[in-house]
Amino acid sequence: MYYGISQFSEAYNKILRNSSSHSSCQLVIFVSCLNIDALCATKMLSLLFKKQLVQSQIVPIFGYSELRRHYSQLDDNINSLLLVGFGGVIDLEAFLEIDPQEYVIDTDEKSGEQSFRRDIYVLDAHRPWNLDNIFGSQIIQCFDDGTVDDTLGEQKEAYYKLLELDEESGDDELSGDENDNNGGDDEATDADEVTDEDEEDEDETISNKRGNSSIGPNDLSKRKQRKKQIHEYEGVLEEYYSQGTTVVNSISAQIYSLLSAIGETNLSNLWLNILGTTSLDIAYAQVYNRLYPLLQDEVKRLTPSSRNSVKTPDTLTLNIQPDYYLFLLRHSSLYDSFYYSNYVNAKLSLWNENGKKRLHKMFARMGIPLSTAQETWLYMDHSIKRELGIIFDKNLDRYGLQDIIRDGFVRTLGYRGSISASEFVEALTALLEVGNSTDKDSVKINNDNNDDTDGEEEEDNSAQKLTNLRKRWVSNFWLSWDALDDRKVELLNRGIQLAQDLQRAIFNTGVAILEKKLIKHLRIYRLCVLQDGPDLDLYRNPLTLLRLGNWLIECCAESEDKQLLPMVLASIDENTDTYLVAGLTPRYPRGLDTIHTKKPILNNFSMAFQQITAETDAKVRIDNFESSIIEIRREDLSPFLEKLTLSGLL
């Protein structure tokens, strides 16, 4: 079943009712540990439940195998389970092997609705919805953003019609079995041997062989009509599931809608909402662009007039200020913020010498000496900083950078400084990716004596390495969680530093890829395979691989051919002898995003990867909540990609 936006408070009150009457913890939240939007949404929920004196347990989870393991370990007394950031695209009842009848405690005689001793709530913005969760289950309860009521009318009708037709077919089969038994063994055997290709002939043959003709012409006609309807409705559902995946909303925005409904909005929750939504800006710009005006209105509503406010060392404010498509401008130099910006790099091709010359000429045209541009922003000439917006407006059009200025959200932390939402998201993402130390210095793996181990031992060793790596990601989740606290400024600064280091590594890897021409054009998609490099270990983390992929995709969007081709990006992990593979959708050049906001480009890699895995003997692990990210054995990559190229699925 599902809750529309106006019904979120009903679900919340139900959770509260079931969880607040016990002295022990009855509420568990499973959260995707590599998802900033899910992190911020869970933080809001945690603060809300804490205010209501409801005990809850938060469990960061990496992928589906961990989901199954953690679910199997839940205590029987857990009556509410929230899945945040995942769960919407799979049949949860089947995957978790849930028998709803085991949990039934009451049934309403009039409506037929059942009450369960455990309810599973799904907060997930990935689409398409799995329709079994939405229409076929009462124990699975999904928070919907309007997708179901607005766009799934045809699919809803097809789903319920198929259920009715299945029941009718079951009744007919029971009736047919009884008649077959009355007709004798010989007749049944003869009927089984009929293999006519034409369905009509088959039905008539079966009817004739049953002697006294228990199936009349009307029954045959009904059967044919039923088969036609089943085929038609199955086609509707197949088309729905094969359309491709995307993210249609911010989970943080959905939780904030709940808070608005129950009167619990404040600046802290709004800031978390802004961070969660901003985290989608790079990969799902249409979602951010749609939600931005709503966030802007909410900031104006909750923020007191600056004329009446007095700044103190502990004042926490949230304002709308000019922001830029530049990398960590307030925490680096103007030059570096241009140089390491994905947007500027793609527009000016900074990865080659001509691009660097254009950048230097641009600063000269703006009247900003390179020596001044390379000063840390904090110490840069204040007159230039004050006039920066005007300088940009006058000079950046000729370089295609006219969209570099936009309004953004800035959080002021008293006398400790200020940070924009986009910069905060960069810091959080870096903490999720790297944590307390650089990836290369952590999780040291001993590769000694690998030649002396047999295949089974190597597999066990690889599994253990993967487990250790995922434990680190869970640890990084809690580091990012703590960084959301306004008092943990040192963690935030650590994240800023890590983000700068990561972006340099991404830039260096991206430049090497473009200079060596490692991106291959394979008719229907672009392919890039990383097999060496000083920063190769960084790309064991899906977030870092996607960071590199977004850098490359943006460069491709601004390239001369400007073909809207998706990309497959693969990186070798020598420790496990596998490739981490990500399928990325193409991207419109910046400036064209607003034209296409109503029709986002869907990711077809999820279905393609699953289908090709089913058709081949390749050892593939599809475990990530981002289903377009897979792990594949080294020797299986080439045949897998060959099959993908010829499949016609993209």
UniProtKB/Swiss-Prot annotation:
Biological processes annotated in GO: DNA replication initiation; double-strand break repair via break-induced replication; mitotic DNA replication preinitiation complex assembly
Chain residue ranges for the region called Disordered: 168-227, 442-462
GO molecular function annotation: chromatin binding; DNA replication origin binding; single-stranded DNA binding
Cellular-component GO terms for this entry: CMG complex; DNA replication preinitiation complex; nuclear replication fork; nucleus
Pfam family, one: CDC45
Domain of life, per lineage: Eukaryota
Cited InterPro entries: CDC45 (IPR003874)
Phosphothreonine modification, residue list: T453
Main location: nucleus
Residue ranges with Acidic residues bias: 168-205, 449-461
Keywords carried by this UniProt record: Cell cycle, DNA replication, Nucleus, Phosphoprotein
Record has Phosphoprotein as a keyword: yes
Localization annotation: Nucleus
Other facts: Present with 1730 molecules/cell in log phase SD medium.
Assembly: Assembles into a complex with MCM5/CDC46. Interacts with MCM10.
Function: Required for initiation of chromosomal DNA replication. Acts at the origin of replication. Also has a role in minichromosome maintenance.
UniProt similarity note: Belongs to the CDC45 family.
Annotated protein name in UniProt: Cell division control protein 45
